[in-house]
């Protein structure tokens, strides 16, 4: 990830602090879908975190008093499940100078000197992008016969699981299959899945998560041999059309380095939402 790329500040766009809070709640909901599954711990307390799926801290609401001890306690608890964690600091996290405290705890190694910060300390935490859905243009060109279907039953989701896992090169997709199967595919589902086909062959897949006052596309996946045909962009476009039809005027995505250019072609722009990342790992890891 090129952290020096220019990002448009959220203040320069029609984005309010509440909008960013909705983004955070949507992000939390994504990880909450996996709560309770084997090998996954999701803690929803003053600090909300996930281990086994993401290894990430999603929200922090701590008091100023004894803050260093609370940071150490959090790392100690998470360290029982993983050797590394991304502590994401959103604008709504407290205290307001949490990032500075995390940096200082990193200098002394966290609890018992067992942890260290690495990477870009206090960096943007990935490729956060924003799109004005009212300006969404035409989908990219795709092979003849390409079309998208929404997953409406278990059989279709089983097919989604195979093509999505293939695109990510994943050997074990049991957590995704279990989480989304448990969530269901009815009209009230927050997670809406899509499969792209050429003829009858599944070639790409994605998920739209509508939750927390926000809508975002996740899990965009195309097998390596089928890439560079506009498939990932086209299925993302189909999901965005559903978000727009549900009344959302804008959206965001947390893009991989590989996917960033795909989303830029749809109109997404790199944006600084005020989110900062502190990457921790155990010194023995």
How does the language model describe each region?
Residues 81-91, 243-255:
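Conserved GNAT acetyl-CoA-binding A-motif
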Residues 40-43, 91-105, 190-204:
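Conserved beta-hairpin
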Residues 1-82, 94:
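N-terminal charged segments
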Residues 48-58, 210-217, 227:
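A conserved beta-turn-beta hairpin within the catalytic core of GNAT-like acetyltransferases
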Residues 171-225:
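A conserved beta-strand-loop-helix scaffold within acyl/acetyltransferase catalytic domains
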Residues 65-155, 276-280:
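Acyl-donor-binding surface of acyltransferase catalytic domains
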Residues 67-75, 219-224, 228-241, 245:
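Conserved acetyl-CoA-binding loop-helix of GNAT-fold acetyltransferases
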């Amino acid at each position: 990830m090129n952290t020096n790329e220019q990002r448009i500040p959220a203040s320069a766009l029609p984005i309010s602090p509440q909008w960013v809070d909705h983004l955070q709640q949507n992000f939390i909901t994504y990880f909450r879908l996996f709560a309770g599954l084997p090998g996954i711990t999701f803690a929803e307390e003053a600090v909300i975190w996930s281990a086994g799926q993401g290894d990430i801290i999603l929200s922090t609401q701590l008091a100023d008093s004894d803050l260093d001890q609370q940071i150490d306690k959090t790392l100690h608890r998470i360290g029982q499940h993983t050797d590394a964690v991304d502590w994401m600091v959103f604008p709504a996290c407290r205290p307001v100078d949490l990032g500075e405290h995390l940096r200082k705890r990193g200098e002394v190694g966290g609890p018992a000197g067992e942890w260290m910060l690495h990477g870009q300390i206090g960096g943007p935490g990935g490729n956060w992008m924003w799109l004005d859905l009212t300006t969404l243009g035409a989908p990219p060109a795709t092979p003849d016969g390409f079309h998208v279907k929404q997953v409406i039953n278990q059989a279709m989701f089983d097919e989604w699981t195979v093509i999505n896992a293939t695109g990510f090169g994943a050997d074990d997709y049991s957590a995704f299959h279990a989480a989304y199967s448990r969530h269901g595919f009815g009209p009230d589902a927050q997670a809406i899945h899509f499969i792209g086909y050429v003829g009858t062959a599944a070639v790409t897949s994605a998920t739209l998560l509508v939750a927390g006052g926000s809508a975002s596309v996740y899990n965009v996946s195309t097998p390596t041999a089928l890439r560079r045909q506009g498939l990932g962009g086209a299925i993302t476009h189909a999901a965005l059309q559903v978000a727009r039809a549900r009344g959302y005027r804008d959206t965001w995505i947390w893009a991989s380095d590989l996917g960033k250019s795909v989303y830029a072609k749809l109109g997404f722009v790199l944006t600084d939402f005020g989110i900062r990342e502190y990457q921790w790992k155990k010194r023995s890891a």
